[in-house]
């Protein structure tokens, strides 16, 4: 184990000098013995000097401190010992419940599975959320992105998905909290504990207060644990909140390392870094990883390089819209912007496909008519268009749904709606079977039966 000494400290970037014939490799983990800090080598500058990024706070470091090379990348424990535990980027427990028992540690830097090992699945995962099951269904082993600006409900929607899928799903789940609020991580831990599924979940947190090196690597640590379960021939759920913070940490690290910024100030290696993470989140012939990733959209601009780079890696995209949230319709999913590769008659069946497209057609026509209504009013529309507007407003309200995880805020008990009921209900609304019910009856209900009951009280 070779030793070196710190020669420069610039915030999270630390230069360390080693003997020239003992220069550490890129991605090697170094230990600052006195401070108990781990550094990761990012660049070899020459003459035995390496530029590293700190995995924790660099407060209190000074030049001349001794640094040991571990001769290996950062490694985290994998396997059953990680279940029910909260870990940091280094795989160390941060829940004060004693050490983690493990038989294997894996490097967080792994090559993605080879092309011939990949496996595709068209099995649909039922989420119990009407708008998701109808418009952008999930595939088992697929990748789903939740896109949305600040405060439109990404984390709540993700928590509901975790609640509905992880509780129904008998396999294991891994949750990586990347640069998000510590409070949300805390809430999530107790939510899992109260619902007795904590023993099936591994939690890896690197929250907002951590330095950029930590936030850049914590997604990889979580993914390594998920890969460990996948290689044990299991089906794993992987939740990442938030992918944007991973990109942002990469931007900060890139600037600290002195690289030339590219569009909008992002790192020049944005696509490569995103690819390195996303290509590993995949299903092989041994097991599957189904991932749900929250993606923050800066200033509600979906063309921003970060969300735009993420789009290309996903099978399904759920776009949350501020306009829909302003109407008080939650989950604020935009049914015209959200897409799924699984919405195909060969996968979901002809009836589901035609119903989803009919719903989108009605909503699209309503969107086109809005300008006419704003200028001339409803009276100028033809009878056919009046019917379409009426149905579209009912569909819009029926796409809302009370969530289990939001029960404490709204007082409405959460609802899980089966896919069969969802398709049948929307088909009936589009066909005009419920034209006699007032539109208020469709707001914040689960099944169509509830809407019928609610109409009687209005």
Curated annotation (Swiss-Prot):
Name the Pfam families on file.
ATP-synt_ab, ATP-synt_ab_N, ATP-synt_VA_C
Q: What class of enzyme is it?
A: translocase
InterPro entries to which the protein is assigned, alphabetical: AAA+_ATPase, ATP-synt_VA_C, ATP_synth_F1_bsu, ATPase_a/bsu_AS, ATPase_alpha/beta_chains, ATPase_F1/V1/A1_a/bsu_N, ATPase_F1/V1/A1_a/bsu_N_sf, ATPase_F1/V1/A1_a/bsu_nucl-bd
Kindly list the GO molecular function terms attached to this UniProt entry: ATP binding; ATP hydrolysis activity; proton-transporting ATP synthase activity, rotational mechanism
What domain of life is recorded for the organism?
Answer: Bacteria
Which residues take part in binding ATP? Answer: 148-155
Catalytic activity annotated for this protein? Answer: ATP + H2O + 4 H(+)(in) = ADP + phosphate + 5 H(+)(out)
What cellular component GO annotations does this protein have?
plasma membrane; proton-transporting ATP synthase complex
Membrane topology label: Peripheral membrane protein
Subunit structure, per the record?
Answer: F-type ATPases have 2 components, CF(1) - the catalytic core - and CF(0) - the membrane proton channel. CF(1) has five subunits: alpha(3), beta(3), gamma(1), delta(1), epsilon(1). CF(0) has three main subunits: a(1), b(2) and c(9-12). The alpha and beta chains form an alternating ring which encloses part of the gamma chain. CF(1) is attached to CF(0) by a central stalk formed by the gamma and epsilon chains, while a peripheral stalk is formed by the delta and b chains.
Supply the NCBIfam families for this chain. atpD
Query: Which family would the database say this protein is a member of?
Result: Belongs to the ATPase alpha/beta chains family.
* Record-given protein name: ATP synthase subunit beta
């Amino acid at each position: 184990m070779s030793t070196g000494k710190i020669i420069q400290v610039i915030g999270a970037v630390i230069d360390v000098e080693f003997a020239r014939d003992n220069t550490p490799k890129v991605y090697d983990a170094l230990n600052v013995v006195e401070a108990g800090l781990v550094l990761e080598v990012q660049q070899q500058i020459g003459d035995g000097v390496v530029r590293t990024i700190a995995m924790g706070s660099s407060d209190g470091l000074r030049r001349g401190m001794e640094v040991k090379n571990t001769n290996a990348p950062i490694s985290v424990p994998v396997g059953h010992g990680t279940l029910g535990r909260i870990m940091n980027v280094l795989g160390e427990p941060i829940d004060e419940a004693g050490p983690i028992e493990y038989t294997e540690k894996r490097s967080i830097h792994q090559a993605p599975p080879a092309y011939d090992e990949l496996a595709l699945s068209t099995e649909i995962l039922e989420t119990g959320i009407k708008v998701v099951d109808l418009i952008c269904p999930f595939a088992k082993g697929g990748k789903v992105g939740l896109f949305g600006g600040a405060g439109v409900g990404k984390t709540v929607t993700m928590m509901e998905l975790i609640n509905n899928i992880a509780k129904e799903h008998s396999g294991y789940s891994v949750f990586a909290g990347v640069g998000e609020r510590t409070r949300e991580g805390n809430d999530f831990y107790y939510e899992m504990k109260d619902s007795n599924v904590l023993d099936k979940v591994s939690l890896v947190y690197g929250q907002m207060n951590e330095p950029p090196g930590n936030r850049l690597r914590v997604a990889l640590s979580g993914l390594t644990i998920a890969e460990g379960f996948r290689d044990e021939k299991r089906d794993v759920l992987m939740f990442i909140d938030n992918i944007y913070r991973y990109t942002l940490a990469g931007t900060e690290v890139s600037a600290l390392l002195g690289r030339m910024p590219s569009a909008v100030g992002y790192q020049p290696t944005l696509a490569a870094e995103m690819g390195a993470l996303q290509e590993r989140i995949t299903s092989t012939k041994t097991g599957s990883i189904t991932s749900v990733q929250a993606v923050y959209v800066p200033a509600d601009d979906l063309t921003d390089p970060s969300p735009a780079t993420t789009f290309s890696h996903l099978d399904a995209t759920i776009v949350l819209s501020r306009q829909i949230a302003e109407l008080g319709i939650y989950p604020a999913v935009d049914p015209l912007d959200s897409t799924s590769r699984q919405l195909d008659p060969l996968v979901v069946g002809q009836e589901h496909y035609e119903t989803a497209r009919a719903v989108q057609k009605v909503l699209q026509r309503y969107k086109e008519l809005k300008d006419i209504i704003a200028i001339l009013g409803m009276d100028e529309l033809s009878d056919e268009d009046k019917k379409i507007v009426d149905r579209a407003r009912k569909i819009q309200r029926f796409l809302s749904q009370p969530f289990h995880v939001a029960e404490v805020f709204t007082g409405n008990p959460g609802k899980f709606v089966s896919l069969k009921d969802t398709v049948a209900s929307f088909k009936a609304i589009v066909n005009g079977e419920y034209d006699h019910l007032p539109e208020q009856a469709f707001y914040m209900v689960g099944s169509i039966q509830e809407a019928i009951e609610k109409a009687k009280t209005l």
